UniProtKB/Swiss-Prot annotation:
Pathway per the UniProt entry: One-carbon metabolism; tetrahydrofolate interconversion
Cellular component terms (Gene Ontology): cytosol
Family as reported in the entry's similarity comment: Belongs to the tetrahydrofolate dehydrogenase/cyclohydrolase family.
Phylogenetic placement of the source organism: Bacteria, Pseudomonadati, Pseudomonadota, Gammaproteobacteria, Alteromonadales
Alphabetical UniProt keywords: Amino-acid biosynthesis, Histidine biosynthesis, Hydrolase, Methionine biosynthesis, Multifunctional enzyme, NADP, One-carbon metabolism, Oxidoreductase, Purine biosynthesis
Name of this protein: Bifunctional protein FolD
Disulphide-bonded residues: none
InterPro entries in the cross-refs: Aminoacid_DH-like_N_sf, NAD(P)-bd_dom_sf, THF_DH/CycHdrlase, THF_DH/CycHdrlase_cat_dom, THF_DH/CycHdrlase_CS, THF_DH/CycHdrlase_NAD-bd_dom
Protein role: Catalyzes the oxidation of 5,10-methylenetetrahydrofolate to 5,10-methenyltetrahydrofolate and then the hydrolysis of 5,10-methenyltetrahydrofolate to 10-formyltetrahydrofolate.
EC numbers on record: 1.5.1.5, 3.5.4.9
Record's catalysed reaction(s): (6R)-5,10-methylene-5,6,7,8-tetrahydrofolate + NADP(+) = (6R)-5,10-methenyltetrahydrofolate + NADPH; (6R)-5,10-methenyltetrahydrofolate + H2O = (6R)-10-formyltetrahydrofolate + H(+)
Protein's GO biological process: L-histidine biosynthetic process; methionine biosynthetic process; purine nucleotide biosynthetic process; tetrahydrofolate interconversion
Length: 284
C-alpha cells in the first residue's frame, strides 16, 4: 500500500480563493472588509517568516492587514495597551500576537487580554472552553485546519481510534477535543506516556505534533491508518522534515500529510476563515 498525500497547499489555496470571493461580495454589498492585526514582539527569524506569510495571505484575500512590529524590549504593559487599542478598533476583527513572546512577558496574560470575539488564534480560555463543551466558535487554527484536511479524504471519523502525540495548548490539547467532537475515541500522548509504540500501532488515525524530526518510526503505522504530521523541522542539510518517518510511513498509511505542504498552509487558511467568521458573526 502506498499512501495518498493530502495536499494541504492545494486545499488551502481553494479556501483562500473562496474567501477572496466572499470579500468581493461584501464590498459589492457595501460592507467593510475584514481586518486583522498582527503583532510581533522581537526579531525571532522563524516568527518573522510566519508573520510575513500571514500578512501576505491577508492581502491576497483582500483583508486589511495591520502590522505592529515591536522591539524585544517592549514591556508587558505596553503590549497589553496595544491589545486594548485593537480590541476597541471597529475596523479590526481579529488580533494575532505571534508566539513565543520574550521571557519577561506572560503569554497567558496576553492571550486573555484579547477579546474572545477577536481571538482568531482560538487560544482564549473562552474559545477553548466552547470547544470543550461541543459548541465551538473561534477554533484553534492548526487543529481546525487538520479537521478540514481529514474531511477532504472522505473518511468517516466516527468510531475511529485516534492517537494525538503531543499535548501542547496550541495543537495537541485542542486537537484531541476536535477529534472527540468528530466522533473519535481519542488518546492523548505526552512525555509521560508509557508504551507509546503500542498506542500508535493500534491507531486508525495518528496526529503527531512534538517538533522532533522522525520521532515516530514509519513502521509503527498501522496498515491503512491516516497520518497527520504537524512537525516542521529543519535538518542541518537544510531539508524540512516532519515528526514522522515519512518514506516508511507512506508505505503503511492510506492517507498522509507531507512536510512541507501538508498542515502548514492550512493553519494560515484557518486563521483567515476565523477572521471572516469574527467579522460576520460578531462585528457586522
Amino acid at each position: 500500500m502506498t499512501a495518498q498525500n493530502i495536499d494541504g497547499k492545494a486545499i488551502a489555496q481553494s479556501i483562500r480563493t473562496q474567501l477572496k470571493d466572499k470579500v468581493t461580495a461584501r464590498k459589492e454589498a457595501g460592507k467593510r472588509v475584514p481586518g486583522l492585526a498582527v503583532i510581533l514582539v522581537g526579531a525571532d527569524p522563524a516568527s518573522q517568516v510566519y508573520v510575513g506569510s500571514k500578512r501576505k495571505a491577508c492581502e491576497e484575500v483582500g483583508f486589511i492587514s495591520r502590522s505592529y512590529d515591536l522591539d524585544s524590549s517592549t514591556s508587558e504593559d505596553a503590549l497589553l495597551s496595544l491589545i486594548d487599542e485593537c480590541n476597541e478598533d471597529p475596523t479590526i476583527d481579529g488580533i494575532l500576537v505571534q508566539l513565543p513572546l520574550p521571557e519577561h512577558i506572560e503569554e497567558s496574560k496576553v492571550i486573555e487580554r484579547i477579546r474572545p470575539d477577536k481571538d482568531v488564534d482560538g487560544f482564549h480560555p473562552y474559545n477553548v472552553g466552547r470547544l470543550a463543551q461541543r459548541i465551538p466558535v473561534l477554533r484553534s487554527c492548526t487543529p481546525m485546519g487538520i479537521m478540514t484536511l481529514l474531511k477532504s479524504t472522505g473518511v468517516d471519523t466516527f468510531g475511529l481510534d485516534a492517537v494525538v502525540v503531543g499535548a501542547s495548548n496550541i495543537v495537541g490539547r485542542p486537537m484531541s477535543l476536535e477529534l472527540l467532537l468528530a466522533g473519535c475515541t481519542t488518546t492523548t500522548c505526552h512525555r509521560f506516556t508509557r508504551n507509546l509504540e503500542d498506542k500508535v500501532r493500534s491507531a486508525d488515525l495518528v496526529v503527531v505534533a512534538v517538533g522532533k524530526p522522525g520521532f515516530i518510526p514509519g513502521d509503527w503505522i498501522k496498515p491503512g491508518a491516516i497520518v497527520i504530521d504537524v512537525g516542521i523541522n529543519r535538518l542541518e542539510s537544510g531539508q524540512l522534515v516532519g515528526d514522522v518517518e515519512f518514506d516508511v510511513a507512506s508505505q503503511h498509511a492510506s492517507f498522509i500529510t507531507p512536510v512541507p505542504g501538508g498542515v502548514g498552509p492550512m493553519t494560515i487558511a484557518s486563521l483567515l476563515e476565523n477572521t471572516l467568521y469574527a467579522c460576520e458573526q460578531y462585528h457586522d
